[in-house]
Amino acid sequence: MVIDEHRLSSLDLRGCPNLKCVEVTNGGNLTSIQLDTCKKLETFNCCANFSIGSLDLLLMPNLKSLKCDYNKIESLDLSASQNLETLSCVSNSLTRLDLSNCKKLITINCKKCPLTSLDCSQLNLLTNIDFSECNQMEDFPKLPKGIKSITCERFPPIANADLSLFPDLTNLKAPYCELKAFDASKCRNLVSLNLWGNHIAALDLSGLNHLDYKSVDTPQKITLGAERIPNKSSLWRLYLPENVDLGKIYSYDYTDDVARRYYSLYTEYFTGDDGIQRPSFVANHLDLDNNLFVYNYKTNLFYEEEGKQKEILMDVYVAAKQVPSGVEDLAAEKTVKGVVYYDLQGHESAVPFSGFNIEVTQFTDGTSQSKKIIK
């Protein structure tokens, strides 16, 4: 039975004991579904009804697949769901989920639920789980050793997870998790890896011999502290994390067309007050409002394409944040040194061109700010 895009406020199917599949989806008024006598039911889909606050599953012992995404369910009693293999409860109001009797579960998707914890350690058949955006969960879930696929978008606690506990892990999706590092040595069997939008400055993927290069997503966004170099007031030093090897930076350039044409950028090791050499970028242009430049980092993982060996590169987009020096007042109003305009061909003028312009405001502290305008 399939009912989609309906206006039902309630549904009573107690007179249909032989039903094996029920799909009631996309209805904003439905508040109750009665399936008390549907003991043969194997598949139940009640996604996107939005008003359902509870489900009674106690008299459905043969249920194998339950999908109840996008409702208002606050609790889910699965004590009688011993045969459940697939559970999807995305975007509900669940704060806890007792899965202790669901020993046959293979796939769980509890994305966007306010769960405070999740224990799946006794679910030995579980291979796939998605707990993305479970923002109330402070600790990484307890998962079985045989888990193969983990999706945890916007889930910072993964930073403290020991992935070596899951030797069968082949797919990991952890975008936007605020990660500053990733230890690939703990998950050697990965085939697919998504670390998009984290804050990783250097990445070593050596040893991931099963990784499919077409299934690797690693663009990063980092913010570096910037400070004017003493006795070189026009130059800024941007401090890279110590684990960055400048020799592994394949290429780099400003993201702005005008900056690429008129400003310089280079890498340099410098010696700190403690005598230790550290990596940095040096620039004579600083834009504190946008991505300043991007660099491509070698990951030590190679693949063959069209008979040539290539290396997977990680794109890292860099923004700058001025570091207080104790001398300058960062809150003080900046003094404008001058304003210049550029057209699409890169021609410079003290006054705006007719049509599209890039306006570059230069300040006396060596920074600049650009914006697009139309005259």
Residue ranges with predicted function:
Residues 358-375:
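C-terminal tail/sorting-segment detector
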Residues 307-323, 372-373:
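C-terminal edge beta-strand
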Residues 191-248:
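Leucine-rich repeat domain C-terminal region
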Residues 1-8, 18, 23-30, 40, ...:
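Concave beta-strand-loop units of leucine-rich repeat
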Residues 283-294, 351-353:
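Surface-exposed, short loops/turns at beta-strand junctions within beta-sandwich domains
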Residues 321-347:
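Residue-level detector of functionally pivotal "anchor" positions at catalytic/ligand-binding pockets or at interdomain
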Residues 13-16, 34-38, 55-60, 78-82, ...:
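A structural signal for leucine-rich repeat
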